[in-house]
Amino acid sequence: HITYPTYEKNFSPSNFVVAAFFREPHKHIESHLNWVRHLMEPKKHDFLIEHPAVVQTIAQKLSLLDFASSKTWQQFVKQLKPVQFGLFDNLQVRYLSDAKPAERVNETHLQQALARLKKIQLVGIAEHFDESMSLIHQAMGFDMPVEKNVRSNVNSFSYGADFSNLDNQQAIGPLVKFDQVLYQQALLQFEQQRVKFSKD
């Protein structure tokens, strides 16, 4: 992932068409928690020790939790330390804003992210991956149609967390509340792209 501040610092906007994908926030945090937890599997040991100490510590903590319990996530949110905010707190807003790693995402960061979202020329939605790729493909003027797109970074493992469950959604709410607003705006831009390219 490349954050928007990193993009602005290192790339000339005039030389690039910017595309970004967004994911339903509950699905995103569920996947991310599973990914970090998976680092504690014995076969992942070498990969785990390549990560910073903060990631290793939280992976170990997650390995001891009951992912299926809403009480787990209530406590997880309450006990999250500033050094861990950058791993789990409203990550999609975080990617588009200037939020510091040890800083909670707030309303100012959300407004900054929404403003930057408007500068992104092509918005993809993970839940509509193939259609998103087709729209991006069409917008870029490529000759050949997109026949098959492969998502190579999809988790195939689960430890029992289900954030389609309302109790779990409420428990994890503080970690996705700003992302939910951003995601709704991303969906709107995606729908606008649908309309635009259906006319072209």
What are these regions (language model features)?
Residues H1-F21, K27-K148:
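PAPS-dependent sulfotransferase catalytic domain
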Residues I2-T6, D98-A99, Q111, P145-D200:
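PAPS-dependent sulfotransferase catalytic core
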Residues E24, I136, D179, Y183:
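A residue-level signal for conserved active-site and pocket-lining positions in enzyme catalytic cores
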